[in-house]
Regions:
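Glycine-enriched alpha-helix->loop->beta-strand junction motifs that scaffold or abut catalytic
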Residues: 140-144, 225-232, 247-253, 278-281
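Metal-coordinating catalytic core of metallo-dependent amide/deamination hydrolases
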Residues: 79-216
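Active-site microenvironment of metallo-dependent hydrolases
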Residues: 62-66, 70-71, 141, 297-301, ...
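His/Asp/Glu-enriched, well-ordered alpha-helical/loop segment
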Residues: 248-258, 262-342
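Hydrophobic faces of well-ordered beta-strands that scaffold small-molecule active sites
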Residues: 30-34, 72-74, 115-121, 144-150, ...
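Histidine-rich, glycine-flanked metal-binding segment
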Residues: 1-28, 388
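A general structural motif
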Residues: 191-193, 213-215, 233-242, 261-268
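Metal-associated gating/positioning segment near the N- to mid-region
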Residues: 22-96
Length: 415
């Protein structure tokens, strides 16, 4: 949306954003991350350690806004079995406690924390014994997005059993025979039935909870999830499946780290290729919040994607996917004023999201990266950072510019 879309005379009585010097910056909507388990890493910095959960959410709140995230969907997983490793933070007791604490943060939105907190409940199909708990949470109003996952080896993300085995060995000291036993156990384990999944999806729809599929690898799975009125396909396995999901009107999600790495960490769909093909329309941070903003500029500089289209992948498109586009996702009259100032700064030499030949005195390419220098949530300033090479006065409020002007005048000699 351009400046011409707004009245040129702002109404100061409406309590809108203060006038801020944004020279040289991109003025963009706050980023919306609908799949992130980052809070697990904050709460559990070591596999056997679980820190205070409320404090961890507030710590994550501060870190996420520094990366431009103004709406976060904490992705908390409900598992029946822990195949790769056992993380106490993913025990159902801790997951339940986190769900309650996220709901409490939402109740205090724009008052006692910095960004908007939402809940994405990830349901693994082996969570048979937790069915009643899952249904209860869906009815509670604490869940904003639910996804159904199946990490059984031989399909989905691990349709290649060699990839599953290599991944498992990266977590645990197991032999090839152990891997075969685990594959057999997982394939034979009890799963939620189609009837149970259908019933949970009906509760979700009744409560206005968005529904997502996960690791889609076939037209049949897409058809089933489409029948449940799922609006999102997370991490489709191939370009053909991503295109098929889009053809059904589903939003398709890939990980921003995939964009940064240039490939999937598990050997599946390349996010860069899929975005360029129009088969992916949403990026999420997955496990690395810093990648969201970096991915936008990587797509611009290394893939030739228009910067506005790149930003849409992390703003308005995820807002539409999660059903919150009437509130956030774009800078528009009537929406919440979640706004960022983003600037590219020099950070040495070499590969980067942006290469600018001749920017250095020696004529070599300067490495740049995007940074958030100011963030507003609901029209309130919640974050500010300053780098030495920013223009004097950049990002400051008008009343501060007077004193800056005085500071730049030559000092009079004492007589």
């Amino acid at each position: 949306m351009g400046a011409s879309d707004f009245d040129a005379q702002p109404d100061a009585t409406m309590g809108v954003l203060p006038v801020v010097d944004a020279r040289g910056a991109y003025v963009v909507p706050g980023l919306i991350d609908i799949h992130s388990d980052y809070v697990e890493n904050v709460a559990s910095p070591r596999p056997s350690v679980v820190m205070d959960l409320s404090t961890s959410l507030y710590k994550a709140d501060r870190e996420l806004v520094s990366h431009g995230v103004t709406t976060i969907f904490h992705s908390l997983s409900v598992y029946g079995a822990h195949v790769f490793d056992h993380k106490p933070i993913r025990d159902f007791g801790n997951v339940s406690a986190l769900i309650d604490r996220v709901a409490a943060l939402r109740a205090g939105e724009e008052r006692d924390h910095l960004i908007r907190h939402r809940l994405h409940m990830r349901v693994e199909l082996d969570s048979v014994d937790l069915y009643d708990d899952i249904e209860s949470f869906l009815r509670s109003g604490k869940v904003d997005l639910v996804s159904f996952m199946d990490h059984t080896p031989g399909q989905g993300q691990y349709r290649d059993l060699l990839v599953f085995g290599d991944t498992l060995k990266g977590y645990r000291d197991v032999s090839d025979e152990d891997v075969r036993d685990i594959v057999r156990q997982q394939q034979e384990s009890q799963k939620l039935t189609y009837a149970q999944i259908t019933a949970l999806a009906a509760v979700a729809r009744e409560r206005g909870v968005s529904i997502a599929s996960h690791d889609d690898d076939s037209e049949d799975k897409l058809a089933f999830m489409d029948g449940l009125e799922a609006t999102i396909s997370e991490f489709p396995i191939s370009l053909d499946i991503a295109r098929a999901a889009r053809a059904r009107g589903m939003h398709t999600i890939a990980g921003a780290p995939n964009v940064m790495l240039g490939h999937s960490h598990s050997g599946n769909l390349s996010a860069r290729e899929a975005v360029q093909a129009g088969a992916i329309d949403v990026l999420c941070s997955d496990y690395y919040p810093a990648a969201l903003l970096d991915a936008v500029f990587t797509l611009r500089d290394q893939c030739g994607l228009d910067i506005a289209k790149a930003f849409a992948l992390v703003t308005i498109n995820p807002a539409k996917a999660a059903g919150i586009a009437d509130e956030v996702g774009s800078i528009a009259v009537g929406k919440r004023a979640d706004v960022l100032l983003v600037r590219e700064i020099s950070c040495g030499e070499g590969e980067s999201s942006g290469e600018h030949p001749g920017a250095r005195p020696d004529g070599r390419a300067a490495r740049t990266m995007p940074v958030v220098t100011r963030a507003f949530v609901g029209g309130r300033s919640v974050f500010r950072s300053h780098y030495p090479d920013q223009p004097l006065g950049y990002g400051r409020d008008p009343e501060q510019l007077v004193s800056l002007d005085q500071l730049t005048r030559p000092l009079a000699k004492a007589v």
